[in-house]
Curated annotation (Swiss-Prot):
Record lineage: Eukaryota, Metazoa, Chordata, Craniata, Vertebrata
Subunit structure: Interacts with the large mitochondrial ribosomal subunit.
PANTHER family the record matches: MPV17-LIKE PROTEIN 2, PEROXISOMAL MEMBRANE PROTEIN 2, PXMP2 MPV17
Entry keywords, A to Z: Membrane, Mitochondrion, Mitochondrion inner membrane, Transmembrane, Transmembrane helix
Pfam families xref list: Mpv17_PMP22 (PF04117)
Species the sequence originates in: Bos taurus
Family that this chain belongs to: Belongs to the peroxisomal membrane protein PXMP2/4 family.
Gene (name only): MPV17L2
UniProt keyword Transit peptide, yes or no: no
Function of the molecule: Required for the assembly and stability of the mitochondrial ribosome. Is a positive regulator of mitochondrial protein synthesis.
Descriptive protein name: Mpv17-like protein 2
Protein localization: Membrane; Mitochondrion inner membrane
Single GO biological process annotation from the record: positive regulation of mitochondrial translation
Membrane-spanning ranges: 20-42, 63-83, 102-122
Membrane topology per record: Multi-pass membrane protein
Length: 218
């Protein structure tokens, strides 16, 4: 990179430092969670629009995702502060405490955030509590199993190497793909997307089933 590029990056870094200090850090973490969750939903909706001709972008859906993400930001901010005070650790010498933090995060924060996500979106979108709870029962274990596949390794890196003030920002940086998955899990349409009178990909149907049945009867 030319010297001018390095100077520009250093200037950008210096300008951004106040966002990660004092009370501004809480605002940064809160808005970061909301923006990344909305961006993940936007990416998912873009894919859905390509896969389903006629579907239009739903801005209210992304706004709901933004609101839920912002509501999670303060929790994550104080959650990591609490974990760091409870189990202080730095680098590989602190690995035992780091592993404790990863385990507690998976057993406490992850399921809590899953419940928060489904019930929060259900509330914002006008679902009844019974319907939201049923959706949570239907999808929670799928969410939680996927969570165990992704986040323990990510949090291990987070607690080992990332400075405390950047922990939520680091997580936000990784969550674009994860939030896209969460949007898919929340809004997916069950079953194959096939028009009436057709069948799933890989089979051939030349006439509707009712017509074939009528022919047999005749």
């Amino acid at each position: 990179m030319p010297p001018g590029g390095w100077r520009w990056l250093r200037g950008l870094w210096a300008a951004g430092q106040p966002l990660f200090q004092g009370r501004a850090l809480l605002v940064t973490n809160t808005l970061g969670c909301g923006v990344l969750m909305a961006a993940g939903d936007g990416a998912r909706q873009t894919w859905e629009i390509r896969a389903r001709p006629g579907q239009k972008f739903d801005p209210r859906r992304s706004v709901s995702m933004f609101a839920v993400g912002c509501s999670m930001g303060p929790f994550l901010h104080y959650w990591y502060l609490w974990l760091d005070r409870l189990f202080p650790a730095s680098g590989f010498p602190g690995l035992p405490n780091v592993l404790k933090k990863v385990l507690i995060d998976q057993l406490v924060a992850s399921p809590m955030l899953g419940v928060w996500y489904f019930l929060g979106l259900g509330c914002l979108e006008g679902q009844t509590l019974d319907k939201s709870c049923q959706e949570l029962r239907d999808k929670f274990w799928e969410f939680y199993k996927a969570d165990w596949c992704v986040w323990p390794a990510a949090q291990l890196v987070n607690f080992l190497f990332v400075p405390p003030q950047f922990r939520v920002t680091y997580i936000n940086g990784l969550t674009l793909g994860w939030d896209t998955y969460l949007s898919y899990l929340k809004y997916r349409i069950p079953g194959p997307l096939t028009p009436p009178g057709c069948v799933a990909l890989g089979t051939i149907q030349t006439e509707p089933p009712d017509a074939r049945q009528q022919g047999k009867t005749d």
